[in-house]
């Protein structure tokens, strides 16, 4: 299986590259594809035609996101949306990673996928918006 993995210099992306060695891996770094540029994302996916897209890449500077909301939303909302659109176009699975920052932390139990979101800051809002965009597109 040919798997395209974004953010391979990050903790999760790097770990995936180490663990999925039985597959043909296409590791994408910031230098390979600027996630603020939708056309670059489309081009990379079209070029490699993967069987699966895994997106652990994210804007993760929680505090700095308050000062750079546009950048946070470009990377955490817009980029995953483009990836989900391409995955749907190619009829392939798309795996995207969430964060606990999509919740407000007021629940006294463990959060689950179906819990209502209520992000308090820009980082959580941008990640939540990305998830909503992916859900609207649907797919595998």
Residue ranges and their predicted role:
Residues 3-20:
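N-terminal Rossmann NAD(P)H-binding glycine-rich loop of SDR-like oxidoreductase domains
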Residues 6, 28, 53-57, 94-99:
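SDR active-site strand-loop-helix element
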Residues 15, 19, 86, 133:
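Rossmann-fold NAD(P)-dependent oxidoreductase module
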Residues 21-43:
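Adenosine-cofactor binding site in Rossmann-like domains, unifying the SAM/SAH pocket
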Residues 39-75:
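NAD(P)H-binding glycine-rich loop region in Rossmannoid oxidoreductase-like domains
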Residues 48, 86-90, 137:
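Helix C-cap/helix->beta junction micro-motif
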Residues 67-95:
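NAD(P)-cofactor binding segment of oxidoreductase domains
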Residues 74, 78-82, 102-140:
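Catalytic helix-loop patch of NAD(P)-dependent Rossmann-fold dehydrogenases
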């Amino acid at each position: 299986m040919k798997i395209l993995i974004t953010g391979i210099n990050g903790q999760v992306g790097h770990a995936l590259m180490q663990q999925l060695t039985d597959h043909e891996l296409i590791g994408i770094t910031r230098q390979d594809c600027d996630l603020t540029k939708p056309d670059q994302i489309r081009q990379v996916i079209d070029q490699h035609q993967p069987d699966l897209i895994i997106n652990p890449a994210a804007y993760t500077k929680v505090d700095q996101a308050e000062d750079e909301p546009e950048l946070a939303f470009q990377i955490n909302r817009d980029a995953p949306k483009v990836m989900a659109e391409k995955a749907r176009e190619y009829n392939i699975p798309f795996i995207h990673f969430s964060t606990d920052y999509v919740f407000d932390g007021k629940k006294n139990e463990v959060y689950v996928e179906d819990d209502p979101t209520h992000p308090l800051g820009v980082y959580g809002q941008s990640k939540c918006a990305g998830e909503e965009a992916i859900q609207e597109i649907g797919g595998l």
